[in-house]
């Protein structure tokens, strides 16, 4: 996910700066990502079946616990889908995507008023998170509200749950790694509802403000950084 966003930002910024159309960016991005996916599949053609069999084995051996974990994640997805905040932030972020798709331009119109911008708002030009959503809307023909309210929130929940599971498999290195990791995910999902006390907590972004990039930064990405730090510490420990 991180690599995907970095590649997209490098690809999108020149199009935004030169005031090219969303359609042009969509064509270039679709071609680029198609090539990347094909190359990745070819290079990992032996590992993909092995990983698939490994996941299938875990689901079969721990059917009940995996079922409970999946249900817990789906409940959070359902909650996040139905409880998105309605405020000026949601108006702006979803409005940017809608304006981009409707006008076939990028950051050339004010998302609040629809008035043409005399120049680029430099702070926003460097943030391509919403432009990526607009590209997805254009590729699949889906309305921006569906992408921003449903898809983005559910993707964040799933990525966060998977990252927490990764942390569990790294910390709990024993015979019951899978069981402990699954329990960690379930407990973490429950704690989000307890921690949702203010609109500025990572739980608030996770459950209610899922349309913002900060929802990913404060959850899936920060947990992934924790996972990398744990891996680094374990590597350093083994080297001494």
Spans of model-derived segments:
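Membrane-embedded, hydrophobic transmembrane alpha-helices
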Residues: 1-58
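Alpha-helical transmembrane segments
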Residues: 1-9, 65-75, 185-189
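Hydrophobic/aromatic residues in alpha-helical transmembrane segments
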Residues: 10, 163-164, 225
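Membrane-interface alpha helices of multi-pass inner-membrane proteins
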Residues: 16, 239-240
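Membrane-interface helix-boundary motifs at transmembrane edges
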Residues: 48-60, 169-180, 234-239
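Active-site lumenal/periplasmic loops and adjacent helix-entry segments of GT-C-fold
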Residues: 72-195, 199-211, 216-220
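Membrane-interface transmembrane helices that cradle and orient dolichyl/undecaprenyl
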Residues: 222-239
